[in-house]
Every structure is written in structure tokens, then in C-alpha cells.
């Protein structure tokens, strides 16, 4: 809550468009606080250009840091320069394997990356549904064992959160991931389908689209995507990439 208030204050005084990224309530001590933060953001939007983005998972991913480990329920190591073969393993299991404390295990692995399980579904759903929220992947392509959001974010929103859970209609789900983002970041002629716009298109089946990537197998292809166009050129079809680089 303090950080959101600080951001709103800076945005108001600087009079610049501001994006709160990636809005979440991490750590059990913060669960439920999205009720307050979203009210603060909604009120601030009346007088400021204030937006927020989020991703559709209750686990985050960044460098392996002791401060982050302390507030997470579970930690998976995504990569380690010193131990490249341990990608995807549980930090607690590695601690037992090495016969070291968690802190010393982190020192042994560092530099390294990790996935932190530290958010609550109710907060996530509330933030996803917030009218002003954009949805992105925040994926990190270079990780040896990436967060599944890298491969599954957008089909997950369309399949799980829109079709199955009905948090918002299909057209709103699409807008949160395309038109809204293009508008906020000033990407002219992108994000919407219109005459004269760049033809960035995804052809998908709304009845079957769903993510398959998991924390155990994070690179599984999603289902229900028939083809993808970038600048009018087909870059994905028949469940595989083409050679086009538009």
C-alpha cells in the first residue's frame, strides 16, 4: 500500500503517465490488500494518467534473492551459472542435497534465477478484473527452465480466466492484452484491427484455446492457436514457426 501511494504521489506531482508494473500482493502478510490498492488506483485515475499491468499467475520470477525467498511459500530455481543442471529443482530440496542452510545454498547457486510462489488467487483475480488493468507475460526468454508465463500467459487468460472462470468477456480479455497496451505505450496502428493498421493477428479457437505450460514443463505449446501474423506475414501455423521474420 505504501509503494502504491508513493507511485501515485510521484505521478501526480510529475504530471506524467505512469504504469504500476507488475501489480501484485506478494507475501502472505499482504494477501487481501488488493482491495485497498485498487481503490487507491481507481481514485487516482480520476486526476492522473495512471495504469497498471499484471500477469495471470500466483508465482513471480526474477533473480534468486534471499529477501524474496523469505516471503515465498515455495521457490523453484530456474537457472544457476554454477550448477546448470539443477534448473527446475525446489530450493528446499537443494538445501537438503547440499547439506546447507537455505542462505548458504543461495550463496552456492548464485548468480541464479528463481520462481517464487507468493501470491493469492483472490488478489490475482481481483487485479485481472480491474477495468484499468493490462495483462502481459513478464516472461524471461533466456531462463533454462522458465516460468510458464513465457509460453502460456495469453492462452491462459482466454481459456481459463475468460472462458472457464468468466472473469470478463472474450472481447475484454483480448483488449486487455492488445488494444489497451498499445494505447498506453503509444504504439500507433497496432493493438486493434482496422484499415491501415499493421496486421498483427492471432487466429484462435475460443472454445479450445488454453495454456499447457506448467511449472514442471514450462515450454509446452498452448492449444487452440491456428496461426499468427506479424505485419501481415504468417509466423506461426500448423503448430510450428515459419521462416518469416517480418
Language-model features, listed with the residues they occupy:
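Divalent metal-coordination and catalytic microenvironments
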Residues: 53, 99, 138, 173, ...
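Structured C-terminal cores of nucleic-acid metabolism proteins
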Residues: 161, 173-176
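Active-site neighborhoods of metal-dependent hydrolases
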Residues: 4, 8-12, 16-166
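Acidic, glycine-enriched loop/beta-strand segments at the rims
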Residues: 114-125, 168-174, 182-219
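C-terminal cap of metal-dependent C-N hydrolases
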Residues: 126-132, 137-138, 153, 201-245
Amino acid at each position: 500500500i505504501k509503494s502504491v501511494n508513493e507511485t501515485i504521489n510521484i505521478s501526480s506531482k510529475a504530471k506524467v503517465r505512469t504504469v504500476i508494473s507488475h501489480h501484485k500482493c506478494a507475501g502472505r502478510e499482504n494477501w487481501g490488500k488488493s482491495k485497498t490498492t485498487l481503490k487507491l488506483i481507481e481514485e487516482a485515475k480520476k486526476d492522473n494518467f495512471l495504469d497498471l499491468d499484471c500477469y495471470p499467475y500466483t508465482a513471480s520470477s526474477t533473480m534468486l534473492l534471499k529477501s524474496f525467498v523469505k516471503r515465498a511459500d515455495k521457490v523453484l530455481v530456474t537457472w544457476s551459472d554454477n550448477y546448470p543442471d539443477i534448473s527446475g529443482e525446489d530450493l528446499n530440496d537443494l538445501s537438503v542435497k547440499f547439506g546447507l542452510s537455505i542462505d548458504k545454498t543461495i550463496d552456492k547457486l548464485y548468480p541464479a534465477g528463481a520462481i517464487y510462489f507468493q501470491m493469492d488467487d483472490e488478489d490475482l483475480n481481483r487485479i485481472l478484473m480491474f477495468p484499468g488493468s493490462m495483462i502481459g507475460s513478464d516472461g524471461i526468454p533466456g531462463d533454462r527452465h522458465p516460468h510458464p508465463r513465457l509460453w502460456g500467459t495469453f492462452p491462459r487468460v482466454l481459456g481459463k480466466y475468460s472462458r472457464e472462470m468468466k472473469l470478463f468477456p472474450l472481447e475484454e480479455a483480448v483488449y486487455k492484452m492488445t488494444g489497451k497496451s498499445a494505447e498506453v505505450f503509444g504504439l500507433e496502428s497496432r493493438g486493434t484491427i482496422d484499415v491501415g493498421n499493421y496486421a498483427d493477428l492471432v487466429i484462435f479457437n475460443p472454445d479450445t484455446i488454453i495454456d499447457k505450460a506448467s511449472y514442471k514443463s514450462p515450454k509446452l505449446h498452448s492449444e487452440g492457436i491456428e496461426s499468427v501474423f506479424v505485419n501481415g506475414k504468417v509466423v506461426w501455423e500448423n503448430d510450428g514457426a515459419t521462416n518469416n521474420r517480418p
